[in-house]
Amino acid sequence: MTVKKLENSSDVNVVTEEVKILTNLLNESTEQLIGKELFTKIQNLIKISADKNYQELEDQIASLDNREMIVVARYFATLPLLINISEDVELASKVNVLNNTNQDYLGKLNDTIDIVAQKKNAKEILEKVNVVPVLTAHPTQVQRKTVLELTDKIHKLLRNYREVKNGIITRVEWTEELRACIEILMQTDIIRSHKLKVSNEITNVLTYYPKSLIPAITKFTARYKELAKKHGLDIPDATPITMGMWIGGDRDGNPYVTADTLKLSATLQGQVIFEYYIKQINQLYRSISLSTSYMKPSTEVMHLSELSNDDSPFRTNEPYRRAFYYIESRLVRSEQKLLNITNQHSFLKERDLEHLDQIPAYEDAQEFKADLEVIKRSLEENRDQAVVKSYFTEILEAIDVFGFHLATIDMRQDSSVNEACVAELLKSAEICDHYSELSEKEKVSLLLNELNNDPRNLHTNNKPKSELLQKELKIYKTARDLKDRLGEDLIKQHIISHTESVSDMLEQAIMLKEYDLLDNQSARVQVVPLFETVEDLNNARDIIKEYLNLDIVKKWLVSQHNYQEVMLGYSDSNKDGGYLASCWNLYKAQKDLTAIGEELGIKITYMHGRGGTVGRGGGPSYEAITAQPFNSINDRIRMTEQGEIIQNKYGNKDAAYYNLEMLVSATVDRIASKQIVSEEYIADFRSSMDKIVTESNEIYKKLVFENPNFLDYFLQATPIKEISNLNIGSRPASRKKLSDFSSLRAIPWVFSWSQSRVMFPGWYGVGSAFKHFIDADKKNLQELQHMYQGWPFFHALLSNADMVLSKSNMEIAKQYAELCQDEKTKSVFDIIYQEWKLTKQIILQIEGHDDLLSDAPNLKNSLASRMPYFNILNYIQLEMIKRDREDEIKGVFQSIIPITINGVASGLRNSG
């Protein structure tokens, strides 16, 4: 049976029709706004770009003045955005059609559960699976919230296109609505005029919950349980998807994340879910108008209705409505009490608002659920099964998934900050005056003694404290208070960036101990190491083994159901060692850590710190998960979802449902599937990969760390400086100076290479390493081909590199190299170009393909259709960078470069 692969797939014919309509409307709106003369220039640029006459394209763009340039840039930044919307709509439509007609596609939940149901431990697998997308605000989402709201409207209109074609919806009215959206879009500021605050990032991300995530997750969870039940597998407590959040708790390198932002994040999350519940209960109140004249409610329902203040004479015979009114009142009171806010709700009568403090708040979400279960049981006793299924299924699932907290907030801090704080605490408590000078063994011994034997909170003495320590302590106090109010699931882990030792983990424990988030018996918050660099990944095995063997850690793990989470950093390991070294060392680290967990009877679970690009661990979701080492996914997996990827995956409920289905199906597949190839076969592959990766790492380091011109090339031949000035995130682009490579954040590093169309982090060093391996023995090419065909990890490795190469453009990259100030710096491009050609050649040779993207024809067609448009954006960007670096651009024209960055990011889709 051939299974359709839908990621990066859409109905080409329908998309072509829609794009033609969108392009015509954009053209008409643009010509109307700017006049025929300038619009003719735009059309001429498209023709030149389609003909690949790049020199003439460069000349024509150089002839435009700044006033013309801003309009032209807006036009070409808008078109890829519209194409994206059309493709997203058609993908969702295709999924719905295939589901409704019982056809198969890769990752379809029905098929996955059908396969798993044959396993002896099927119930255990399906009951325990938990996939957690963790939303972050890393600076790659360059679109404003206002623009996203406009694109949502266009998305909704395009969803109706088939009805328009069939005459169900009037074409003229539909077209005019679409035209109005495009006219507004063309005259709306695409780029923010001010840098985002953390509070803005929180509110922006939370908008995805009511419009897509909550409805998609509740629908998916209900469907998941229903499909399992068809196989006789009753899993009422399963939560295949829960959500995570970094914004407000991730303070690593972001001085603007404080105790206040943590509290704000928790409060706003609570508001979102309470508003959802209140809206749903209000809908139940309005809909379930059953009268005692025709049915007999349970005694429990009558009790709830009697507690209600709804004394309307029209409700006398409607106990369900009165019960819902009471539940709704309790929810409003709970929101006020638990979140410390006062919200007015129009459904409550003014008299009830005055006496709201007399209504008991729910202690937790399960108490709220219990009231709904009372009503559900009563309806079932009256055989109102359709009412129960239609009105109760999804809200009850929502309570189990979201509670009163919505999403689990991760806390994160750099290990160096923890060390500084612990050193200060130990000194102020007169325990140790020179902690940082101790050896690793001495540090561990001292910290264990404190954790095991010293019940004190070290900060409680009256000695003055540094600003840093005060800030950190306040965050831990806030975390404890929030957990006490909103439940244990609100904050469950604290991640340590740059974990290099056991003492780094124990220092984190000391900080948690200061506000009783752990003690010598149990832990309310888990210490989670983040291994980022290649060196740290190689050391992870020894660090984790020593840590897990500590007696106090064993006690903590008992309180956490014997799970230990480890976070793996894709971005920094790539920047540190290159694409192959990063992927391979992450793979090996997982195998090693999983083996340690099995040896000690502890489930090691992984948090994957992925970004949108291949250079940051991105790529198609299904393949990314099924390419993980066998046995590395026990039942829980978490992964970051960053920047523009959040909009792409979760921008609407159809896309959200499909992408969540891919994540869960892939996870279940990886847990349930047997080893495709033997361990001995993989052992041979591992030996070969070790050799290849060593070579690749040397090639990468020779250029990045040993070539004296490389850093200057990066700073001059990419828009890194311009990206650093963008108002696209609260976090600085670099921890120190931009010219300090070690402190440069991985995200702007990758984003800059994407903009210059080199896509360097996703492929550099691959070609030479493989060629060296092939040249060493003529049989090695055949081995690589076998690896590609039979090893999911290696297949995904090459497929992702293939995709990255297809999005690169060396002709454009060469023009960015011309920005370099001297020939020595410019010569770095020649090294990059030679490696690019070799990598493309070798990858195609191993894959057995003639062209890139041979296995992804839909993506290939998509890129081909948009390339002529967003290639022009690169040339506009280049010209404006030249002008700005020669004589700083001022005023409204400062927005031109950011507009082009926005457009290129939209065109590439996974750019940061």
Swiss-Prot record:
GO biological process, one term: tricarboxylic acid cycle
Assigned GO CC terms: cytosol
Enzyme class: lyase
Catalytic reaction list: oxaloacetate + phosphate = phosphoenolpyruvate + hydrogencarbonate
An annotated Gene Ontology molecular function: phosphoenolpyruvate carboxylase activity
InterPro entries found in the cross-reference section: PEP_COase, PEP_COase_bac/pln-type, PEP_COase_Lys_AS, PEPCASE_His_AS, Pyrv/PenolPyrv_kinase-like_dom
Record bears the keyword Lyase: yes
Keywords: Carbon dioxide fixation, Lyase, Magnesium
Required cofactor names: Mg(2+)
Active site: H138, K575
Any single Pfam family the record assigns to this protein: PEPcase
Keyword Metal-binding: no
Entry's transmembrane regions: none
EC number in record: 4.1.1.31
HAMAP family, per database record: PEPcase_type1
NCBIfam families attached to this UniProt entry: PRK00009.1
Entry's family note: Belongs to the PEPCase type 1 family.
Function: Forms oxaloacetate, a four-carbon dicarboxylic acid source for the tricarboxylic acid cycle.
Name the UniProt record assigns to this protein: Phosphoenolpyruvate carboxylase
